[in-house]
Amino acid sequence: MVEALLSGIVPGLIPITLAGSFVIAYLQYRRGDQLDL
């Protein structure tokens, strides 16, 4: 039961985690770009 639940959650969380880390890195890049101006 738990294994089946995890096997369904983990593959769904991977793209969300990648997208979230990409957005955070982009926002930090934009913030640093604004500080340079």
From Swiss-Prot:
Claim: Cell inner membrane is one of the keywords in the record: no
Subunit structure: The 4 large subunits of the cytochrome b6-f complex are cytochrome b6, subunit IV (17 kDa polypeptide, PetD), cytochrome f and the Rieske protein, while the 4 small subunits are PetG, PetL, PetM and PetN. The complex functions as a dimer.
Record has Cell membrane as a keyword: no
UniProt GO molecular function: electron transporter, transferring electrons within cytochrome b6/f complex of photosystem II activity
Name of the molecule in the record: Cytochrome b6-f complex subunit 5
GO cellular component labels: cytochrome b6f complex; plastid membrane; thylakoid membrane
Subcellular location: Plastid membrane
